[in-house]
Amino acid sequence: MTDYKATLNLPSTAFPMKAGLPQREPEILQRWNSIDLYRKLRQIGEGRPKFILHDGPPYANGNIHIGHAVNKVIKDMIVRSRTLAGFDAPYVPGWDCHGLPIEHKVETTFGKNQPADLTRERCRAYAAEQIEGQKADFIRLGVLGDWDNPYKTMDFANEAGEIRALAKMVEGGFVFKGLKPVNWCFDCGSALAEAEVEYQDKKSDAIDVAFDVEDADKLAAAFGLASLAKRASIVIWTTTPWTIPANQALNVHPEFVYALVDTGERLLVLAEELVESCLQRYGLAGEIIARCEGKALELIRFRHPFYERFAPVYLADYVETGAGTGIVHSAPAYGEDDFRSCKHYGMENDDILGPVQSNGVYVSDLPFFGGQFIWKANPAIVEKLAEVGALLKHESIQHSYMHCWRHKTPLIYRATAQWFVGMDKVAHDGSSLRRRALDAIEQTEFVPAWGQARLHGMIAGRPDWCISRQRTWGVPIPFFLHKESGELHPRTVELMEQVAQRVEQGGIEAWSKLDAAELLGDEAAQYEKITDTLDVWFDSGTTHWHVMRGSHPMGHEQGPRADLYLEGSDQHRGWFHSSLLTGAAIDGHAPYKGLLTHGFTVDENGRKMSKSLGNVIAPQEITDSMGADILRLWVSATDYSGEMAVSKQILQRSADAYRRIRNTARFLLSNLDGFDPAQHMAPNDQLIALDRWAIDRALLLQREIEEAYTTYKFWNVYQKVHNFCVQELGGFYLDIIKDRQYTTGADSLPRRSCQTALYHIAEALVRWIAPILAFTAEEIWQYLPGERNESVMLNTWYEGLAELPEGFELGRPFWDKVMEVKAAVNKELENQRNAKAIGGNLQAEVTLYAEESLAGELARLGSELRFVLITSAVDIAPLAQAPAEAVDSELAGLKLLVRKTEHSKCGRCWHHLPDVGSHAEHPEICGRCVENIEGAGEVRHYA
């Protein structure tokens, strides 16, 4: 038997079938490094339109987790796709370095009592060490960026830039000192930002407390009575007994109806709609003897249960009747609403009682409870209320309560003297920061769109921003306050610039070492140099000022507004929020044109990642076992607008999809063996019809892919690429062309036409996947034929794809119909194989009984229809002639009849044909193969 293998164009490539990503990816990283890819991208980007994605800095503490990986991969997909779209898209990674978590870590290691300068030195060293670890992990994910020059908020230039940003806000009239309740953590010993507060369930003491009336005549008059016949009390309900020693007022809603209830022993004032539930709670019977609106109770005084002072009634719209009594006890030092209400009624700061110290302990001279920690004092306060006859009910309730994000301990609101950025303070230009920020939101594009309403609601309802902290490791607030008046030095902005210049040279330590006399001269004795530091959200929130336009070597190129900020959805109250406020204050607009948010990672059951649940998947595990490209493919395939489910099983599905894409690329490469595009590319107008369709289909797909990348719908890119590889290529085109590719002459037009199409598709495909499968695309790039530059990323979207001309004989609708017919035939062939009626498809001869229009369409392929259906023979007959044994197909107007061929198998092309054995010199092969070996070669037009 003759071996015809040498006469076939069998596929061949050195591109490995097995990816081996954990081993191969580090080699590709080394290659990118050796060719200085990032710098080359900046060089070729000169003169291109810019696209700036400004990096929200992760905190420089601990290993990266899967959420970090998701964030950086999405950013990288955007930067890479914008680069391929012809933009200059630099990416400067950053780190957030100051703040309590690092200071806490250093204190845990070295103790709390070390000198402040030593603490700062150790914090700086610790942050630098953490950055190196995180940086290595981000690079391993394939994230392309300026890793040699990242920005760090602890860089001296950035610390100085932050002071300059603060000076701009002082100059604009937005910064003031005030006494206000702020979120306070006893363990931190400092105020916390809103973004540092999380809510957990907490068990609390809920108490109903009676305040006896002092102005009995006024209370009687309010209820339309001549006098009160017995002891009368107003009742409050609270879950914070520890605030009772700080009570200074009582709040009622001006429009609610309040009832005077006779319970026998005493009269109680309660909101009318809560009377029944309150009496039931107290185990009392009673009847309403009078009613009045809340506004009638204004300024009537009641006695504190155990201190010799009075609590007047103030009107407040925030009072609700969802629980409690409809009356709120007001401790202005420990509640935002309470504080506002008391200030509205003229209470001076000096009159506000604040018996709780920064460590949560009452001042020592507080009667009854001095020196006690507030949480431990609760039982004693309840006991005291019972002792004086003021306690009507005590029970324990479970409710959601604010906790420190770091220590997981309960927080309180605590009025302290702090520095604030005023939301409603009218700036020098007559506008408020709140108005500026809300206007800026309207000018910002949000992905997903619901982010706009969310951020708008947060800005509309937020209090003034407390920017001061009482910590060591942070950028100083370099203010000098007059010792008598408490006012800022009149040259504050000028002095801040002088401090910034010193910090630029010596870091934040320059402020702690500074002698006030160096700047103030003889005035120094009159001024106090403050020691507060800035909220870390001010650090990251001003990077648009001191990184995008300042400290970074690329800063001047980036300008005042980034095209995009991209972080997790929690950053609406974090980095997006603080950046918006500082941008609106300094520049009058947001520092970003667009905001993109992604959801959090959960396991396959929708549960939060947690060590206790054992469902945590570290990105390092994925890169070590499966490769970064598998993680990147999973990110691309997942709709990030909601929760992002990840598990080993889900990642395995991504690995399976990866293999299908890789195998498609390998098929393309192996069939381009020996193809030199400079010599062998067939002209477009000479290409076989099916090849022209394949190129046209790739062009249409590329347009859809470009649109999906532009709108950040990476899951659409994934689906389109995967479906193209599996269905249109793997399930249709590549299957059909194998015969032509392998059996026609090596340099024949049918084969070169096919290779031309494969080449165009490969050139396009490698670019489509480059933003997602960064490593694999680079690997494919090295195996593609023809002259090319060093990296796929040094190119733009492929421009060699040609559209089918209008009126082309076999256009898109034609091939869509052919695919449907092929799917119907494949289904019946599979049935026949399963029934053992045929072996392979080439043992089959098919008759298509088709209605007239379909028959006419299929007939256009002539004898080449069999190559499309991959059977040895195809006949077309009228649908009306279909015999009883013909099988219905899912395609209307088509029936099928498959029969096993009686002809011999060609030993070269494996088709079963009547002329096999008719050629004396080649008795084992068909006439077509003889022509392809010895003659001019077969002619193909369509397939």
Swiss-Prot record:
GO terms for molecular function: aminoacyl-tRNA deacylase activity; ATP binding; isoleucine-tRNA ligase activity; tRNA binding; zinc ion binding. One of its GO terms (biological process) is isoleucyl-tRNA aminoacylation. It holds the Pfam family zf-FPG_IleRS. It is found in: Cytoplasm. Binds 1 zinc ion per subunit. It catalyses: tRNA(Ile) + L-isoleucine + ATP = L-isoleucyl-tRNA(Ile) + AMP + diphosphate. Zn(2+) binds at residues 906, 909, 926, 929. ATP binds at residue 611. A motif ('HIGH' region) lies at residues 58-68. CDD domains: Anticodon_Ia_Ile_BEm (cd07960), IleRS_core (cd00818). GO terms for cellular component: cytosol. L-isoleucyl-5'-AMP binds at residue 567. A motif ('KMSKS' region) lies at residues 608-612. IleRS has two distinct active sites: one for aminoacylation and one for editing. The misactivated valine is translocated from the active site to the editing site, which sterically excludes the correctly activated isoleucine. The single editing site contains two valyl binding pockets, one specific for each substrate (Val-AMP or Val-tRNA(Ile)). Belongs to the class-I aminoacyl-tRNA synthetase family. IleS type 1 subfamily. Monomer. Catalyzes the attachment of isoleucine to tRNA(Ile). As IleRS can inadvertently accommodate and process structurally similar amino acids such as valine, to avoid such errors it has two additional distinct tRNA(Ile)-dependent editing activities. One activity is designated as 'pretransfer' editing and involves the hydrolysis of activated Val-AMP. The other activity is designated 'posttransfer' editing and involves deacylation of mischarged Val-tRNA(Ile). This is Isoleucine--tRNA ligase. It comes from Stutzerimonas stutzeri (strain A1501). The gene is ileS.
